[in-house]
Amino acid sequence: VAVTLAWLGFAAPALAGPPEWGRAVVRIELKTDAQLYLYQFKKEIVQQTGEPLNAAKVDESLKRLYATGRFVSLRADAEPDGGGVVLTFVGKARYFVGLVQVTGTPKPLDSSTLVAATRLPLGRPLYEDELATATQNIRNVLRDNAFYQATVQSSVERNPATQEVQILMTITPGHQARLRGVAFNGHAAYSPDRLRSVTGWHPGDRLTSPEIEKGLYKIHNFYLKRGYLQASTNIQKRVFHPKTNTEDLIVECEAGPVIEVHVRGASISRHKLRDILPLYQDGVIDQPSLERGSRVLTNFYQQKGFLRAEVTIEPVEHIQADHMRITYRVALGPAGSFAGYKFAGNNHVSDAILASVMTIRPAQFPFQTAAFSTRMLDDDINSLKGVYQSQGFLDAQITPHFNYYYQDLPQRLFVTLDIQEGERTMVGQIDLQGVTDEQRKALLPGLANQQGLFYSPENEQKDRDTILRYFTNRGYSHARVIASSSPAGQEHLMDVRYQVRPGNQERIERVVLLGNKHTREGVVRRELSFRSNQPVNESALLDSQRRLYDLGLFNQVQIAPQNPQTQETDKSVLVSMEEAPRWTVGYGGGIEVQRLGSNEPQGQLKASPRVSLEVSRIGVGGRNQTLTFRGRLSTLDKGADVSYYVPKFPKRPDISVRLNANVDSSRNVLTFTARRKEASIVMEKRWSQTTFLSARYSFRKVQALDLSNRISASQIPLASRAAQIGMFALSYINDHRDNPIDATRGSYSVADAGVSWSGLGSEANFLRFSAQNATYYRLTPFMVFARNTRLAIESPYGALRHVTVTQPDGSQQIVLTHAIPLPERFFLGGSDSLRGFSINQAGPRDPQTGFPIGGNALFLNSLELRFSFAQDRLGVVLFHDMGNVYSSIRRMKLLKFYQNSPTDFDYTVHALGIGFLYKTPVGPLRFDVGYAVNPTRYQVAGQNGLEVRRLPRIQYFLSIGQSF
């Protein structure tokens, strides 16, 4: 005879004294359709083996098992076994949402949008009806984007070991419908043809949901500009025609009344009026809305310098049933200026602290304009009161006093803020309830409110957050903290109480990885800040999510505990990942306009088209490693390089290694074609997000070609000889810029030192050092001052080296030389350096041909004043560049601004100029015009002897990105 007691979330019926009750339980079993085991539920099962079978205990066990959220249904079976009874809990396991994937997503939609539309959050229970709802949600999104014929099939894969279910939504999108026509219903006030022209929708278009919203927004703006402030537009219906795969849009338009808004007594543009008046945003015409508009206009005119401006509202005129007129009357008063403010009576809070929250400000030549209005002042007074309350002065009062005749000048306003601080409220007793002695000992020192210190409501809220964070980071995800304060029995003394309800501590039973098809499990687990058998730490979950995103291997990462809404203490943590495409192909093209290579020493103004290709493969071998190939081709250079990047080497998060190999041939120096073959290895140590040190070894073979008629014939055999360079170098970089592409604040510093040595495989021994420092200062919201300084030197060392060169007649000659190979010398000039020269035209030149031959020292200092307009879309730059390339560090004379002769190039060139910028998604598009104040003179040997020439004073540059 079997006795069954069932639990489906309600009380089980009592059974009247069957023969099994009271008999000893010899064994307890658990049978489910998932891999759940009895030891996991020791706390929930109160009926124990060896005890008499008790109906109340069995019923309580069923209740507790069901409360874990692990079961859809449960029952208890009791069967005789010898002299006792076997108690079996039989249940149907509940499954939880795991990885949700969508395949077949049509363009222009993306899979992440459709996954979000399913509304199936990771780790939550999956109910029977939710799958159908999720499928319908995806269909709705597809229909909203004109995929009416799309079909969506859902499939699930249950994992009994983890109780998670993987959901796959397969889309067959069909063809996107085209627009057949647009009809308008309602009181539109304009013809359908006029409104259709406004939307930008045309027959034959494939309209997505964003494009429809954009068209509706255009109609709304169309009405707004014509005074229909209460107009409403929405899609009433979308009619699909299956035979032609087209759709009709039915748009409902209600124009509403025409509302004229006039401002009398002062001028203001219609555009500005639409921007600042509330009724243009919400369309509400009532007294509170009109009064808000009055205050906004008062603030506007006072900031314009009319410090006593007042704005009143005239009664609303109803011209017709559908036509109203609203008039604001402005009394500007005399124009004035705001001279400044001061604090009086602040004995405990410094002027500097108080001034840090003020928004009103006097004008300061040359960059800062004045800002003042009574509204700004009221907001500042509230901010000052907040500062005082945070310092314990709960009753502080601040009264402004206005002096409109400051320094005996009429309409020159000075404000004195008279502060009555009052008594400071102190903290009496601190009562931390609901915690253990160990927890109290850990928490009390970290609280902002401390006994004997000043009391602050702000600190009370901070303490609540501190306590809550302490518990949630230790597995108490359901913790609650109630903060309260009460008078301590004497004046200006507050007792503070924190009532804590921690709930049950949750621990991580296991970590389940989902979606890492190609990425190795170890790569993922190394980034996790939590492990099994640790308390569930919400901060660790968020930190792990951030670290996985930082790998660059995943498009989306979600981390959540399974079954989060129950009081179950042993949690599975799910890590769901959507892997990014492993292969990426990028290509581009462009044109560079500068003085490029020619037979003339100064070059000719030419356009250089260029194309580039980049192919990268992430996750090589399932690891966090990247292989990249890059190729480029232009009239200036051509080349290719391959790199292999290994971050976190070997498992250190602060060390990375990069292997590089490249081959290129470039003509960016007029004098020669530089051919280079190079291999290098770079190891980088990152100290922080802004600072890192790198060490690199590079081995390259360089050669200068096409030297005929560009340098003296006697120098060609040595200069054209191929040279091997083996160099070890260290670099230090400190980057505090707010935006590396277009910085407005911060600084950037780099220092690099290298040695080329025969012991490293080099045929030329020389030392090289370079340094750069750039700083950026925002002077006003629309003006940035930027400075960049570069210094570089190189010097040969050691004994003269024996070099075998081949003469033009084929004979070989041994030469003793210290010369640094031509492609290894410094060159300067161009859009991102010294804009008084074209690309790489600065510095020493050959005394016979006049072509640049580079130098062993370089200095550049650039100053820029950057202005922005049109909401930062346009910009103007005024710049001054100074510097040059020098033959050696000993001949670097920064204060020498002239040449002694046409063969003396060791002087400093100054260049002034202006640049124009247009912001694009890839960076600022920049056109610069540079003017050399003291351009270089050089000599050229001609048929009639030496001829002295001068480089052009004016240079033109077109490029993308800021110069530094």
Show which residues each predicted segment covers.
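Outer-membrane beta-barrel architecture
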Residues: 574-576, 614-616, 628, 643-645, ...
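Periplasmic polypeptide-binding modules associated with outer-membrane biogenesis and secretion
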Residues: 15-597, 610, 614, 628-646, ...
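Transmembrane beta-strand segments that form the barrel wall of outer-membrane beta-barrel proteins
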Residues: 528, 560-561, 585-603, 613-634, ...
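Transmembrane beta-barrel wall of Gram-negative outer-membrane proteins
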Residues: 636-722, 730
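Residue-level signature of outer-membrane beta-barrel architecture
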Residues: 617-619, 646-648, 663, 685, ...
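Residues that define the transmembrane beta-barrel architecture of outer-membrane proteins
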Residues: 134, 215, 293, 380, ...
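Repeated loop/turn-to-beta-strand initiation elements of outer-membrane beta-barrel proteins
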Residues: 555, 583-585, 619-627, 649-657, ...
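C-terminal outer-membrane beta-barrel translocator/porin domains of Gram-negative envelope proteins
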Residues: 550, 572-573, 584, 590-604, ...
